[in-house]
Regions:
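Short secondary-structure capping/turn micro-motifs that flank functional sites
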Residues: 36, 69-70, 135-136, 257-258
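Substrate-binding cleft of extracellular glycoside hydrolase catalytic domains
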Residues: 1-125
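Short, solvent-exposed alpha-helical surface patches in non-cytosolic proteins
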Residues: 203-274
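Short beta-strand/turn micro-motifs composed of small residues
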Residues: 64, 130, 153
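Functionally critical loop-and-helix segments that line ligand-binding/catalytic clefts
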Residues: 1-12, 17-22, 140-205
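Aromatic-lined carbohydrate-recognition surfaces of secreted/lumenal glycan-active proteins
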Residues: 123-136
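Glycine-rich, charge-decorated loop segments at or immediately adjacent to ligand/cofactor-binding or catalytic sites
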Residues: 73, 134-144
Length: 274
């Protein structure tokens, strides 16, 4: 599969999400902000972009631009992301944007591991965004292989040799008078992330919880079944067996379905044999 998307920050100004949708854009990855957990470093448009994306029915992901030079700074950046997400689970994941020249000499493997582990501990899907050159040099570590990659390579094809999920192929995608970074996603992220959430929810259920849920579902089913009227095809048989005392209905005089083999079906059988 191949799905068109864009990434958006405050530098794009006020974005027309309706125009994006009309142009065939299926997802957006929104900048949370940059660096450590300071409100002054939040992306000024993040909250508004989330509202607009959701109003347009567009699934979104999020990214944080990193300045972390060590694990401690990466922890603060993780807190920054989690504060802004406020319990949301973006259907296109949370990405750690590792590209700034100031961190070129840092222990990038440690900072990426720290940030991504914090996202996963919060039940979020985590990945790493970087240029092709950084992914094949500074970030080319087996320790980062478990994390999804979003590859920035403005080219006619992505030549990253390892598995990746998203390719940022241009910074010149023009839509509705605005210019965006254009991306292709090669995974069904909403399905993956929703399934991941279901597994996490199921993993936290005790045996008693499972039994309680099953009982509630069964009770709801039979309660709904009990409210159904006699089916038209069984009406004559029901009236006949009631009149002859072959069967009895409910205390209120009604004769609703009550089980998988319903009494109205039994009535039809008795009518045929009597």
């Amino acid at each position: 599969m191949q799905t068109q998307g864009v990434d958006i920050s405050e530098h794009n100004g006020a974005v027309d999400f309706a125009a994006l949708t009309q142009a065939g854009v299926k997802f957006a990855i929104l900048r949370l902000g940059y660096g450590s957990d300071y409100a002054s470093q939040d992306d000024a448009q993040f909250a508004q972009n989330v509202r607009k994306a959701e109003a347009a029915g567009m699934p979104w992901g999020a990214y944080l631009y990193s300045y972390a030079k060590d694990a401690s700074m990466a922890q603060s950046e993780a807190r920054h992301a989690l504060r802004l997400l406020q319990g949301r689970k973006p259907l296109y994941g949370v990405w750690y944007d590792v590209e700034d020249s100031q961190i070129a000499g840092a222990d990038l493997v440690a900072t990426c591991q720290t940030f991504c582990a914090a996202m996963e501990a919060a039940g979020l899907y985590a990945g790493i965004y970087a240029s092709l050159s950084w992914l094949t040099t500074k970030l080319n570590s087996p320790q980062l292989d478990p994390y999804d990659k979003w590859v920035a390579q403005w080219n006619s094809a992505c030549t990253y040799p390892k598995p990746y999920g998203i390719w940022q192929y241009t910074d010149r995608l023009a839509i509705g008078g605005q210019v965006f970074d254009g991306n292709w996603a090669y995974k069904d992220y909403p399905a993956i992330i929703q399934a991941m959430g279901s597994q996490q929810e199921g993993a936290n259920l005790t045996e008693a919880d499972v039994k309680k849920l099953a009982r509630q579902e069964m009770e709801a089913y039979f309660a709904e079944l009990a409210q159904k009227p006699v089916s038209p095809w069984a009406q004559a048989a029901v009236e006949s067996v009631l009149a002859r005392g072959l069967m009895r209905g409910d205390a209120d005089g009604s004769f609703r379905p009550q089980s998988f083999i319903t009494r109205q079906e039994v009535a039809a059988v008795l009518e045929n044999f009597s």
